[in-house]
Amino acid sequence: MAAAAATLRGAMVGPRGAGLPGARARGLLCGARPGQLPLRTPQAVSLSSKSGLSRGRKVILSALGMLAAGGAGLAVALHSAVSASDLELHPPSYPWSHRGLLSSLDHTSIRRGFQVYKQVCSSCHSMDYVAYRHLVGVCYTEDEAKALAEEVEVQDGPNEDGEMFMRPGKLSDYFPKPYPNPEAARAANNGALPPDLSYIVRARHGGEDYVFSLLTGYCEPPTGVSLREGLYFNPYFPGQAIGMAPPIYNEVLEFDDGTPATMSQVAKDVCTFLRWAAEPEHDHRKRMGLKMLLMMGLLLPLVYAMKRHKWSVLKSRKLAYRPPK
Protein backbone atom coordinates (compact mmCIF):
# COMPACT_ATOMS: atom_id res chain seq x y z
CA MET A 1 0.00 0.00 0.00
CA ALA A 2 2.81 2.40 0.82
CA ALA A 3 4.67 1.48 -2.38
CA ALA A 4 1.60 2.24 -4.50
CA ALA A 5 1.19 5.67 -2.89
CA ALA A 6 4.85 6.52 -3.54
CA THR A 7 4.52 5.53 -7.18
CA LEU A 8 1.42 7.73 -7.65
CA ARG A 9 3.15 10.71 -5.96
CA GLY A 10 6.15 10.40 -8.24
CA ALA A 11 3.91 10.35 -11.28
CA MET A 12 2.17 13.57 -10.20
CA VAL A 13 5.26 15.54 -9.24
CA GLY A 14 7.72 14.18 -11.76
CA PRO A 15 11.45 14.54 -11.70
CA ARG A 16 13.23 17.88 -11.20
CA GLY A 17 13.68 19.82 -14.47
CA ALA A 18 10.97 17.89 -16.34
CA GLY A 19 7.68 19.61 -15.60
CA LEU A 20 5.73 18.09 -18.48
CA PRO A 21 5.21 14.56 -17.04
CA GLY A 22 4.01 15.90 -13.72
CA ALA A 23 1.70 18.42 -15.39
CA ARG A 24 0.43 15.68 -17.68
CA ALA A 25 -0.32 13.55 -14.70
CA ARG A 26 -2.19 16.35 -12.98
CA GLY A 27 -4.18 16.98 -16.15
CA LEU A 28 -5.05 13.36 -16.45
CA LEU A 29 -6.15 13.19 -12.85
CA CYS A 30 -8.32 16.33 -13.22
CA GLY A 31 -9.96 15.11 -16.39
CA ALA A 32 -8.24 17.48 -18.86
CA ARG A 33 -6.90 16.48 -22.23
CA PRO A 34 -3.20 16.56 -22.86
CA GLY A 35 -3.61 18.93 -25.84
CA GLN A 36 -5.03 21.68 -23.64
CA LEU A 37 -1.86 22.09 -21.58
CA PRO A 38 0.26 25.23 -22.30
CA LEU A 39 3.69 24.57 -23.74
CA ARG A 40 6.32 26.67 -22.04
CA THR A 41 8.96 26.33 -24.71
CA PRO A 42 11.51 29.08 -25.58
CA GLN A 43 9.85 29.59 -28.97
CA ALA A 44 6.44 30.25 -27.41
CA VAL A 45 7.86 32.68 -24.87
CA SER A 46 9.69 34.70 -27.53
CA LEU A 47 6.55 34.97 -29.66
CA SER A 48 4.36 36.17 -26.78
CA SER A 49 6.67 39.03 -25.72
CA LYS A 50 6.76 42.43 -27.53
CA SER A 51 10.18 43.67 -28.44
CA GLY A 52 10.83 47.47 -28.17
CA LEU A 53 12.75 49.79 -30.46
CA SER A 54 16.43 49.31 -30.72
CA ARG A 55 18.86 51.89 -29.41
CA GLY A 56 19.85 53.00 -32.89
CA ARG A 57 16.26 53.66 -33.91
CA LYS A 58 15.64 55.70 -30.77
CA VAL A 59 18.66 57.86 -31.54
CA ILE A 60 17.48 58.40 -35.13
CA LEU A 61 13.96 59.36 -34.04
CA SER A 62 15.31 61.78 -31.42
CA ALA A 63 17.56 63.41 -34.00
CA LEU A 64 14.68 63.76 -36.46
CA GLY A 65 12.51 65.38 -33.77
CA MET A 66 15.23 67.87 -32.88
CA LEU A 67 15.77 68.71 -36.56
CA ALA A 68 12.02 69.27 -37.08
CA ALA A 69 11.77 71.56 -34.04
CA GLY A 70 14.85 73.50 -35.12
CA GLY A 71 13.52 73.87 -38.66
CA ALA A 72 10.18 75.18 -37.39
CA GLY A 73 11.92 77.73 -35.16
CA LEU A 74 14.16 78.85 -38.03
CA ALA A 75 11.14 79.26 -40.32
CA VAL A 76 9.34 81.41 -37.75
CA ALA A 77 12.44 83.56 -37.22
CA LEU A 78 12.96 84.06 -40.96
CA HIS A 79 9.29 84.89 -41.49
CA SER A 80 9.44 87.52 -38.74
CA ALA A 81 12.56 89.03 -40.28
CA VAL A 82 11.04 89.14 -43.76
CA SER A 83 7.77 90.69 -42.57
CA ALA A 84 9.45 93.22 -40.26
CA SER A 85 8.70 96.03 -42.71
CA ASP A 86 5.00 95.09 -42.62
CA LEU A 87 4.82 95.18 -38.84
CA GLU A 88 1.85 97.16 -37.55
CA LEU A 89 1.03 98.28 -34.07
CA HIS A 90 -1.77 96.32 -32.45
CA PRO A 91 -4.42 98.48 -30.75
CA PRO A 92 -4.72 98.26 -26.97
CA SER A 93 -7.89 97.05 -25.30
CA TYR A 94 -9.90 99.99 -23.98
CA PRO A 95 -12.45 99.72 -21.13
CA TRP A 96 -15.63 100.32 -23.14
CA SER A 97 -18.74 100.71 -21.02
CA HIS A 98 -20.74 98.29 -23.19
CA ARG A 99 -18.34 95.35 -22.95
CA GLY A 100 -19.72 94.00 -19.70
CA LEU A 101 -21.84 90.89 -19.66
CA LEU A 102 -24.93 92.89 -18.69
CA SER A 103 -23.82 96.33 -19.96
CA SER A 104 -25.73 98.21 -22.64
CA LEU A 105 -24.64 100.82 -25.13
CA ASP A 106 -24.45 104.43 -24.01
CA HIS A 107 -27.28 106.00 -26.01
CA THR A 108 -26.20 109.56 -25.29
CA SER A 109 -22.82 108.62 -26.73
CA ILE A 110 -24.58 107.13 -29.77
CA ARG A 111 -26.35 110.45 -30.33
CA ARG A 112 -23.10 112.39 -30.12
CA GLY A 113 -21.43 109.82 -32.37
CA PHE A 114 -24.09 110.31 -35.03
CA GLN A 115 -23.43 114.03 -34.85
CA VAL A 116 -19.72 113.34 -35.44
CA TYR A 117 -20.52 111.14 -38.42
CA LYS A 118 -22.92 113.69 -39.86
CA GLN A 119 -20.56 116.67 -39.55
CA VAL A 120 -17.15 115.01 -40.04
CA CYS A 121 -17.29 111.54 -41.57
CA SER A 122 -20.23 111.72 -43.99
CA SER A 123 -18.31 113.93 -46.42
CA CYS A 124 -16.24 110.89 -47.50
CA HIS A 125 -17.73 107.73 -45.97
CA SER A 126 -21.13 106.21 -46.66
CA MET A 127 -23.41 104.12 -44.45
CA ASP A 128 -25.52 102.27 -46.99
CA TYR A 129 -27.26 99.96 -44.51
CA VAL A 130 -28.47 102.48 -41.92
CA ALA A 131 -31.74 104.39 -42.38
CA TYR A 132 -33.18 107.31 -40.46
CA ARG A 133 -35.90 105.08 -39.04
CA HIS A 134 -33.21 103.08 -37.24
CA LEU A 135 -32.45 106.12 -35.09
CA VAL A 136 -35.97 106.22 -33.65
CA GLY A 137 -36.02 104.99 -30.07
CA VAL A 138 -32.23 104.70 -29.95
CA CYS A 139 -30.92 108.24 -29.81
CA TYR A 140 -33.72 110.35 -31.35
CA THR A 141 -37.47 110.59 -31.10
CA GLU A 142 -39.63 110.04 -34.16
CA ASP A 143 -40.12 113.77 -34.74
CA GLU A 144 -36.39 114.46 -34.40
CA ALA A 145 -35.56 111.67 -36.84
CA LYS A 146 -38.11 113.03 -39.33
CA ALA A 147 -36.54 116.48 -39.06
CA LEU A 148 -33.10 115.01 -39.71
CA ALA A 149 -34.36 113.12 -42.75
CA GLU A 150 -36.03 116.21 -44.21
CA GLU A 151 -32.72 118.09 -44.16
CA VAL A 152 -31.45 116.05 -47.13
CA GLU A 153 -32.75 115.95 -50.70
CA VAL A 154 -33.38 112.49 -52.13
CA GLN A 155 -33.80 111.70 -55.81
CA ASP A 156 -37.08 109.93 -56.52
CA GLY A 157 -39.26 109.16 -59.47
CA PRO A 158 -40.10 108.92 -62.17
CA ASN A 159 -43.10 111.23 -62.02
CA GLU A 160 -46.06 111.35 -64.40
CA ASP A 161 -43.86 112.87 -67.07
CA GLY A 162 -41.23 110.14 -66.68
CA GLU A 163 -38.68 112.44 -65.10
CA MET A 164 -36.73 112.04 -61.87
CA PHE A 165 -37.25 114.66 -59.19
CA MET A 166 -35.84 115.65 -55.82
CA ARG A 167 -37.88 115.44 -52.63
CA PRO A 168 -37.23 115.85 -48.88
CA GLY A 169 -36.04 112.73 -47.14
CA LYS A 170 -38.29 110.39 -45.17
CA LEU A 171 -37.75 108.01 -42.29
CA SER A 172 -37.56 105.09 -44.71
CA ASP A 173 -34.64 106.64 -46.61
CA TYR A 174 -31.10 105.49 -45.98
CA PHE A 175 -28.24 107.82 -45.25
CA PRO A 176 -27.18 109.65 -48.43
CA LYS A 177 -23.99 108.66 -50.22
CA PRO A 178 -21.21 111.24 -50.54
CA TYR A 179 -20.30 110.03 -54.06
CA PRO A 180 -22.50 108.67 -56.85
CA ASN A 181 -20.17 105.73 -57.63
CA PRO A 182 -16.83 104.21 -56.54
CA GLU A 183 -14.97 105.80 -59.45
CA ALA A 184 -15.97 109.28 -58.31
CA ALA A 185 -14.92 108.40 -54.76
CA ARG A 186 -11.46 107.28 -55.92
CA ALA A 187 -11.03 110.35 -58.10
CA ALA A 188 -11.78 112.64 -55.16
CA ASN A 189 -9.44 110.82 -52.74
CA ASN A 190 -6.22 110.37 -54.76
CA GLY A 191 -7.15 106.85 -55.83
CA ALA A 192 -8.17 105.60 -52.37
CA LEU A 193 -11.69 104.28 -51.87
CA PRO A 194 -13.22 105.31 -48.51
CA PRO A 195 -14.85 102.22 -46.99
CA ASP A 196 -18.48 102.03 -46.01
CA LEU A 197 -18.86 102.46 -42.25
CA SER A 198 -22.02 100.44 -41.68
CA TYR A 199 -20.15 97.34 -40.47
CA ILE A 200 -16.63 98.72 -40.13
CA VAL A 201 -16.41 97.76 -36.43
CA ARG A 202 -17.26 94.13 -37.17
CA ALA A 203 -15.14 94.06 -40.31
CA ARG A 204 -11.86 95.05 -38.64
CA HIS A 205 -9.81 92.95 -36.26
CA GLY A 206 -9.98 94.70 -32.90
CA GLY A 207 -13.37 96.31 -33.47
CA GLU A 208 -13.85 99.68 -31.85
CA ASP A 209 -10.37 99.45 -30.30
CA TYR A 210 -8.87 99.52 -33.79
CA VAL A 211 -11.08 102.38 -34.99
CA PHE A 212 -10.35 104.46 -31.87
CA SER A 213 -6.61 103.85 -32.16
CA LEU A 214 -6.66 104.68 -35.86
CA LEU A 215 -8.48 107.97 -35.32
CA THR A 216 -6.20 109.09 -32.50
CA GLY A 217 -2.93 107.49 -33.65
CA TYR A 218 -1.71 109.98 -36.26
CA CYS A 219 1.86 111.13 -35.65
CA GLU A 220 4.98 112.28 -37.42
CA PRO A 221 6.83 109.55 -39.33
CA PRO A 222 10.01 108.31 -37.63
CA THR A 223 13.45 109.13 -38.92
CA GLY A 224 14.21 107.37 -42.16
CA VAL A 225 10.57 106.91 -43.20
CA SER A 226 9.44 109.02 -46.14
CA LEU A 227 5.88 109.25 -47.39
CA ARG A 228 4.73 110.48 -50.74
CA GLU A 229 2.45 113.45 -51.03
CA GLY A 230 -1.11 112.83 -49.89
CA LEU A 231 -0.23 110.08 -47.37
CA TYR A 232 -0.08 110.31 -43.58
CA PHE A 233 1.75 108.17 -41.05
CA ASN A 234 -0.39 106.03 -38.75
CA PRO A 235 1.22 103.08 -36.92
CA TYR A 236 -2.12 101.28 -36.54
CA PHE A 237 -2.86 101.20 -40.28
CA PRO A 238 -1.43 98.30 -42.33
CA GLY A 239 1.67 99.68 -44.01
CA GLN A 240 1.63 102.77 -41.75
CA ALA A 241 0.75 105.00 -44.74
CA ILE A 242 -2.90 106.06 -44.93
CA GLY A 243 -4.54 108.35 -47.44
CA MET A 244 -7.07 109.79 -44.97
CA ALA A 245 -6.02 113.03 -43.35
CA PRO A 246 -6.45 113.28 -39.56
CA PRO A 247 -10.24 113.61 -39.36
CA ILE A 248 -10.67 114.71 -35.74
CA TYR A 249 -8.90 117.02 -33.36
CA ASN A 250 -9.79 119.03 -30.28
CA GLU A 251 -12.90 121.18 -30.73
CA VAL A 252 -13.55 119.85 -34.23
CA LEU A 253 -17.28 120.40 -33.53
CA GLU A 254 -19.65 121.42 -30.76
CA PHE A 255 -21.90 118.80 -29.22
CA ASP A 256 -25.55 119.67 -28.73
CA ASP A 257 -25.47 118.59 -25.07
CA GLY A 258 -22.43 120.73 -24.24
CA THR A 259 -19.95 117.87 -23.79
CA PRO A 260 -16.35 119.06 -24.36
CA ALA A 261 -15.32 117.91 -27.83
CA THR A 262 -11.83 116.66 -27.09
CA MET A 263 -10.15 114.31 -29.53
CA SER A 264 -10.60 111.26 -27.31
CA GLN A 265 -14.24 112.14 -26.58
CA VAL A 266 -15.05 112.57 -30.27
CA ALA A 267 -13.33 109.28 -31.14
CA LYS A 268 -15.10 107.44 -28.31
CA ASP A 269 -18.54 108.70 -29.33
CA VAL A 270 -18.16 107.91 -33.02
CA CYS A 271 -16.83 104.43 -32.17
CA THR A 272 -19.85 103.80 -29.96
CA PHE A 273 -22.13 104.94 -32.78
CA LEU A 274 -20.35 102.63 -35.24
CA ARG A 275 -20.67 99.73 -32.79
CA TRP A 276 -24.42 100.31 -32.64
CA ALA A 277 -24.63 100.60 -36.44
CA ALA A 278 -22.80 97.28 -36.87
CA GLU A 279 -24.81 95.53 -34.14
CA PRO A 280 -28.14 97.27 -33.50
CA GLU A 281 -29.40 94.18 -31.63
CA HIS A 282 -26.64 94.52 -29.00
CA ASP A 283 -28.89 95.49 -26.08
CA HIS A 284 -31.73 93.18 -27.12
CA ARG A 285 -29.34 90.23 -27.36
CA LYS A 286 -28.08 90.77 -23.82
CA ARG A 287 -31.61 91.19 -22.46
CA MET A 288 -32.67 87.93 -24.09
CA GLY A 289 -29.58 86.21 -22.67
CA LEU A 290 -30.43 87.42 -19.16
CA LYS A 291 -34.03 86.22 -19.52
CA MET A 292 -32.81 82.85 -20.75
CA LEU A 293 -30.49 82.48 -17.76
CA LEU A 294 -33.36 83.28 -15.39
CA MET A 295 -35.67 80.79 -17.10
CA MET A 296 -33.00 78.10 -17.07
CA GLY A 297 -32.46 78.73 -13.36
CA LEU A 298 -36.15 77.95 -12.79
CA LEU A 299 -36.45 75.05 -15.20
CA LEU A 300 -33.29 73.13 -14.32
CA PRO A 301 -34.44 72.24 -10.75
CA LEU A 302 -37.77 71.01 -12.15
CA VAL A 303 -36.05 68.91 -14.78
CA TYR A 304 -33.69 67.47 -12.16
CA ALA A 305 -36.61 66.62 -9.85
CA MET A 306 -38.42 64.89 -12.71
CA LYS A 307 -35.33 62.93 -13.61
CA ARG A 308 -34.65 62.06 -9.97
CA HIS A 309 -38.14 60.86 -9.03
CA LYS A 310 -39.85 59.87 -12.26
CA TRP A 311 -36.96 58.05 -13.89
CA SER A 312 -35.47 56.51 -10.75
CA VAL A 313 -37.73 53.47 -11.19
CA LEU A 314 -36.39 52.81 -14.67
CA LYS A 315 -32.84 53.56 -13.58
CA SER A 316 -32.94 51.03 -10.72
CA ARG A 317 -34.86 48.37 -12.64
CA LYS A 318 -32.99 45.09 -13.07
CA LEU A 319 -33.54 42.56 -15.82
CA ALA A 320 -33.29 38.87 -14.96
CA TYR A 321 -32.69 36.35 -17.72
CA ARG A 322 -34.48 33.08 -17.27
CA PRO A 323 -33.41 30.54 -19.85
CA PRO A 324 -36.13 28.37 -21.27
CA LYS A 325 -36.50 24.99 -19.61
From Swiss-Prot:
Functional note: Component of the ubiquinol-cytochrome c oxidoreductase, a multisubunit transmembrane complex that is part of the mitochondrial electron transport chain which drives oxidative phosphorylation.
Subunit note: Component of the ubiquinol-cytochrome c oxidoreductase (cytochrome b-c1 complex, complex III, CIII), a multisubunit enzyme composed of 11 subunits. The complex is composed of 3 respiratory subunits cytochrome b, cytochrome c1 and Rieske protein UQCRFS1, 2 core protein subunits UQCRC1/QCR1 and UQCRC2/QCR2, and 6 low-molecular weight protein subunits UQCRH/QCR6, UQCRB/QCR7, UQCRQ/QCR8, UQCR10/QCR9, UQCR11/QCR10 and subunit 9, the cleavage product of Rieske protein UQCRFS1.
One annotated GO molecular function: metal ion binding
Protein's cellular compartments: Mitochondrion inner membrane
Species: Bos taurus
PANTHER family noted in UniProt: CYTOCHROME C1, CYTOCHROME C1, HEME PROTEIN, MITOCHONDRIAL
Pfam families: Cytochrom_C1
Keywords: Electron transport, Heme, Iron, Membrane, Metal-binding, Mitochondrion, Mitochondrion inner membrane, Respiratory chain, Transit peptide, Translocase, Transmembrane, Transmembrane helix, Transport
TM segment ranges: 282-315
Gene3D superfamilies in the cross-refs: Cytochrome c-like domain, Cytochrome c1, transmembrane anchor, C-terminal
GO cellular component, one term: mitochondrion
Family: Belongs to the cytochrome c family.
InterPro entries for this protein: Cyt_c-like_dom, Cyt_c-like_dom_sf, Cyt_c1, Cyt_c1_TM_anchor_C
Residues of the signal peptide: none
Entry superkingdom: Eukaryota
Descriptive protein name: Cytochrome c1, heme protein, mitochondrial
Topological category with respect to the lipid bilayer: Single-pass membrane protein
Cofactor note: Binds 1 heme c group covalently per subunit.
